[in-house]
Amino acid sequence: MLRFLNQCSQGRGAWLLMAFTALALELTALWFQHVMLLKPCVLCIYERCALFGVLGAALIGAIAPKTPLRYVAMVIWLYSAFRGVQLTYEHTMLQLYPSPFATCDFMARFPEWLPLDKWVPQVFVASGDCAERQWEFLGLEMPQWLLGIFIAYLIVAVLVVISQPFKAKKRDLFGR
């Protein structure tokens, strides 16, 4: 399995599949926001940023999957998936155990050199409350679904990183 994952990490297909899944999740979030009129909270915006990190890592990996650039993509992927797990866990705890003392910020805080909320306000401006439950599917809230998704991204990322020393076997079909 590790040899297979190493082989996949050196091809564009797996990276593009990951980019497609992250893009589909981002488009779904925008659909929830602009069509279903659900208000994203600050943690939702940060989770969206973590998902953009996974998308960016996938695109970097797809650019040159056989070069050391894929290691940069793996580091970004690991970091983004890990931060996504942290953020969605915090968001889930805020929704499951609401407290007047544990709340999220009113506005997303981006660095001065990257004011995403000013550059693309349709995507990065938060207007909702983190503890408010707005959407449920099969008994799980949106942060709980995202927690599972980010855990899956993180597990696969760890396995792909572990698989890097395992080179694919060369198949000699006609040799002895």
UniProtKB/Swiss-Prot annotation:
NCBIfam families: PRK01749.1. The keyword Nucleotidyltransferase does not apply. The chain crosses the membrane at residues 15-31, 50-65, 72-89, 145-163. The gene is dsbB. Residues 1-14, 66-71, 164-176 are cytoplasmic. The keyword Transmembrane helix applies. The lineage of its organism: Bacteria, Pseudomonadati, Pseudomonadota, Gammaproteobacteria, Enterobacterales. It is found in: Cell inner membrane. It is a multi-pass membrane protein. Required for disulfide bond formation in some periplasmic proteins. Acts by oxidizing the DsbA protein. Disulfide bonds join 41-44, 104-130. Belongs to the DsbB family. This is Disulfide bond formation protein B.
